[in-house]
Structure formats: C-alpha cells, structure tokens
C-alpha cells in the first residue's frame, strides 16, 4: 500500500483523454445492444477514475505548498485544461440521454446517475470553455493571495490560521486587537478582493447568458446538481431561519453574555467566539498530538471507524498542521485510483480546530465506504448530502472529547460552545447564501452596493452582533473572507441544510446514541444513490424545507443550552 507522498504523478495527456472520451461517445451512439452501451459507460467511468485521481493528487500537493513551483504549474495546467475535459464529459452525457437503453443503464448505475447526467449535460457548452478557464484563473489568484497573506500583529507576522487562534484568546484586549489586525488587512486589500469578485460575477453572468439562461443563479443551481429543491424552497427555508432560528440565537447570545460577564444587549464581534469567562477550553498546540488523539477516538468509536482510521494512518492520507504557504481552509477529497480519501487541515491549536478535524474526517468516512465500488465516481454525493456526513461526525465523536481536553469541565465547555456555534451558523450560512442570490440576480451591483446588501442581511440574520466600529465589519465587507463565495458559488446553503440534519441526529443521540450512530452509518454508506430529500426521508428525519421543521431544532437546542 502506497502512502500519499508516494503516489506517482505524471501530467496527463489531455488530448489523449479527450480523444478517449470522444471514442467512447461514438461507441455509445453506435451501440445497438444494451451491453455495448454499458461497456461504453464502464469505459467512461474508468477514464473518470484516472483523471479525477491524477488531478486530485496535483491539486492537493499544490494546496499543501502553494509556493512549490512544480505543482504551481500543474495547478495552472488543470485550471486551463479542466474545462476542456469537462466539455468532453458533457458530450458523453448527452449521448447517454439520447441512448435507447436507459432502463438497462439505470439497472446497473442507478436512477440518480441519469438524473445527475441531465444536470451535467446542461452545465456547460463549448461557448463558455474560455470563460471557465478565466474563472479558474481568478479563483487561483484569490487562493494564492490568501495562502500567502501576512498579517502584522504585535511585532510579528502571522498567517490567517494564526490570527484565528488569537481571535478566541482569553484576553479580551488581544481578541479585539486580533480582530482589528484582520480588519486592517482586509481594508488595506479591499480593492483586490472587490476586483477579483467583481470579475468573477461578470464572468459567471456572461457564462449564463451564453448558455441562454436568465442569470448565473440558474446556472449555479444546475452546476450544484440541485436535483430535489429550487430557489423557492430555499426561500421557505430562509423564512424559517428568520422566524424560528434567529430569535433562538438571540436568547442564546444573552446567555453567552451573562456567562462571560458582559452586559445584556448586543454581543461584540470579538466576544462572539469567546464562550466562557475563565476562557475557552484548551487543547493540543501540536497537530501531531491532536491527530494521535483523533486516531484513538475513531478506533474506539466503532468497528467501521476503526478500519477507516487505520487506513488513513497507514497511508498518511492527511496533512494536518497549518504552515506558511499552505492554502487556507480545510477539505476532504477522494483519490479513487488509489481507493483513498485525503483530509486537508490547517490545525493551529484552537478548540475549533478539533471540530474541523472531525468534520473533514466525516467526509472521508463516506469516501471510505465507497472506495471499493468503482461506480462511486458516477454517483458522488451531492454536497447537501456530503455535508451531513461531516457535520454529523462532529456530534458523533463528542464521546471522545476527553482525549483532547484535560478536564471534564473543558469537555462540557466544548460541547456547549459547539452547540451554540452550530445554532448560530444556521443564520450565518443562510445569510451567505442569500447574499449570493442577491449578487447573481443583480449582477450590475457595484462593489460598494454589494457591501450595502451584506450589511442589510446582517440586520436580518445577525441582529445580535455589535461590530464596535471595526471598519471591515461595520462596512459590510465580512463576506470577502468567505472563500466559497469566490471559488464555490451556491455551495454554502448545503452546509446549512446538512446542519439541520446533523442536529436531528444529535437530538436522537441525546436519548439513544447507538440508535443515532447506526442511522448515521446507514445514511453514510448510501453515499450519492439518492437525492437529499429522498435520503433524509428514508432515514426517518425531517426535510428542512417543510414549514415548521426548524422550530423543533430551536426548542431542542435551547433546552440543552438552558441546562
């Protein structure tokens, strides 16, 4: 078994890949039997496995060190030629939809495969390849700038993950100064962020126009495989957030203020992630120590998680520590040719980093279950489902928190702060998504007008927040820090929807953990075989678009916070 560092990498021959896909498309069109059609799809699947794997290896190695000149060029290569391969895949998908053997195809690959192919076929045309290449280059520009960001603080130069730790310091003055330092950085570089985002909005809007669509909102939903809900459903969900969740958060924040000895009213932005008067729970400073504890938790949780973490350890399928030049953020990817998940972290020693670790390893748990089935690459979970795997794992691993925190008091603190954070996130995440709808429904907005729209949304979704005249926050620029707005439009609502499902697993687990965990494992094993709505209903949980579905969550969480 090869370790991730040993995976071979050779730049792929894009012309050969496109030619292979073209040949398979011709074979599919000419197929006069179901078996010939299925053979063509199997061939397509195998090309996909190889291409996705080599691209994932290159991208991950680049993200680990964005200063590596070799993988910097490889990342540029995929940004340029990825859309060319995508177009060949779309053409193959169109041939599937025109095929006479749809029942036989569904029998082998599942109904959802055809549903997703229908979305893929509508996701691009030859007219937008050049625009997609430009879009990728703009995203890379944003990511590279963030990865190399240097923030002056108290005579030192810090990275973004480093400043994040200080923003939750026990010392209020340090927290405030850290928020001010981050504000200074973003204000100083505001023109850069505005110009990149403005270019992205114009680019994506032009893509939608060239494809004959009303706006990029419509195209964004297609590209996110929204196979079971619409903007109208999301609008119903938003109203529930405003009516049921925001009032609950406001009550939670009053309790929060009381805990930290601050007067009732709005909470200062630099107190929002400081949950206890005597300090947030303290965990390991070292990423190696953190990972050793995480391995123990997974080995003890269940036979499935034990086998999973043993694979991850043996292959070193993760990179945990934060360092200069590393891409900001965390994610999980799959490398199907090696049957390997890979988890990318930026551990800097905060309690929140522990949660992020379990979140990303939750994604990997799903990849682990699908690793032996080659058809998984054809039916990857849509992101709303994928985020259930990760957000629920945050709760499922709480029984092992004593391995990260020295006292039972700190374990209790971590559980409470995580619960409050997740509740608050429902409103914040919805605000991010609402902002995207406004931006892409009104692409003519200027950067200043976008900031005004964000500030208006703050009043709807975070009326409890006091920005204390810190310029970056007061002027509606906070959205610039949200990477998904730049690199993954219309992704963010998937986190929020998944959080409502994770809360339901948590609620069941408070009464019967084993039942909740087995339900979670069953859902995770199903991967992308069903739509989000169908999977949630099959699991016996409430779909968040249904009116009244969020009231139960608000009541359950508040009851726990009141204990």
Where are these predicted regions, by residue range?
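A well-structured
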Residues: 1-280, 293
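Active-site-adjacent bridging/hinge elements
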Residues: 113-115, 218-223, 265-271, 329-340, ...
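C-terminal, non-catalytic "cap/extension" segments appended to globular domains
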Residues: 114-118, 228, 357, 365, ...
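Glycine- and acidic
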Residues: 123-124, 180-189, 229-235, 272-283, ...
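Active-site-adjacent "gating/activation" loops or surface patches in catalytic cores
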Residues: 161-173, 283-358, 363-367, 471
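Long, well-ordered alpha-helical segments
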Residues: 197-208, 213-214, 218, 252-256, ...
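Inter-helical turn/loop segments and adjacent helix faces that build the functional surface
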Residues: 231-232, 255, 259, 301-304, ...
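Post-HExxH zinc-binding segment in Zn-dependent metallohydrolases
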Residues: 243, 381-410, 417-420, 424, ...
């Amino acid at each position: 078994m090869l370790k991730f560092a040993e995976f071979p990498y050779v730049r792929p021959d894009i012309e050969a890949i496109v030619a292979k896909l073209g040949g398979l498309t011709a074979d599919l069109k000419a197929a006069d039997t179901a078996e010939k059609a299925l053979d063509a799809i199997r061939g397509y699947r195998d090309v996909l496995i190889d291409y996705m794997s080599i691209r994932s290896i290159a991208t991950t190695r680049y993200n680990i060190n964005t200063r590596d000149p070799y993988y910097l060029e490889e990342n540029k290569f995929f940004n340029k030629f990825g859309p060319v391969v995508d177009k060949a895949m779309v053409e193959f998908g169109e041939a599937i939809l025109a095929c006479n053997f749809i029942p036989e195809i569904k029998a082998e690959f599942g109904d959802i495969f055809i549903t997703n192919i229908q979305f893929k076929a509508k996701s691009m045309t030859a007219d937008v390849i050049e625009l997609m290449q430009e879009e990728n280059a703009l995203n890379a520009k944003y990511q590279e700038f963030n990865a190399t960001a240097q923030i002056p603080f108290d005579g030192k130069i810090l990275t973004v993950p480093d400043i994040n730790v200080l923003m939750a310091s026990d010392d209020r003055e340090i927290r405030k100064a850290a928020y001010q330092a981050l504000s200074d950085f973003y204000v100083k570089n505001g023109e850069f962020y505005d110009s990149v985002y403005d270019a992205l909005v114009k680019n994506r809007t032009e893509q939608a126009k060239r494809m004959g669509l009303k706006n990029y909102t419509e195209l964004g939903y297609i590209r996110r495989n929204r196979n079971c809900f619409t903007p109208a459903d999301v609008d119903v969900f938003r109203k529930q957030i405003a009516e049921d969740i925001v009032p609950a958060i406001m009550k939670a924040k009053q309790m929060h203020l009381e805990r930290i000895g601050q007067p009732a009213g709005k909470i200062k932005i630099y107190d929002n992630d400081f949950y206890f008067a005597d300090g947030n729970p303290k965990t390991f400073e070292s990423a190696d120590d953190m990972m050793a504890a995480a391995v123990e938790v997974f080995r003890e949780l269940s036979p499935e998680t034990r086998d999973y973490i043993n694979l991850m350890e043996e292959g070193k399928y993760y990179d945990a520590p934060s360092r200069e030049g590393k891409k900001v953020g965390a994610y999980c990817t799959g490398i199907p040719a090696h049957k390997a998940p890979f988890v990318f972290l930026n551990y800097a020693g905060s309690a929140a980093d522990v949660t992020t670790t379990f979140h990303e390893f939750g994604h990997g748990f799903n990849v682990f279950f699908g690793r032996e089935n080659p058809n998984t690459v054809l039916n990857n979970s849509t992101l709303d489902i994928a985020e259930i795997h990760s957000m629920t794992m945050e709760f499922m691993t709480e029984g092992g928190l004593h391995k990260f925190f020295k006292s039972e008091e700190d374990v209790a603190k971590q559980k409470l702060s995580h619960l409050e954070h997740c509740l608050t996130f429902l409103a914040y995440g919805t605000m991010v998504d609402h902002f995207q709808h406004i931006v892409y429904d009104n692409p003519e907005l200027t950067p200043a007008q976008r900031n005004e729209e964000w500030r208006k949304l703050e009043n709807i979704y975070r009326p409890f927040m006091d920005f204390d005249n810190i310029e970056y926050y007061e002027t509606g620029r906070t959205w610039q820090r949200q990477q998904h707005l730049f690199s993954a439009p219309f992704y963010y609502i998937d986190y929020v929807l998944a959080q409502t499902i994770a809360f339901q697993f948590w609620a069941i687990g408070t009464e019967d953990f084993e039942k909740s965990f087995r339900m979670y494992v069953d859902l995770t094993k199903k991967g992308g075989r069903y739509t989000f709505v169908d999977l949630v209903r099959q699991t016996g949980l409430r779909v968040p678009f249904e009116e009244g579905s969020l009231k139960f969550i608000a009541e359950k969480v508040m009851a726990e916070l009141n204990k």
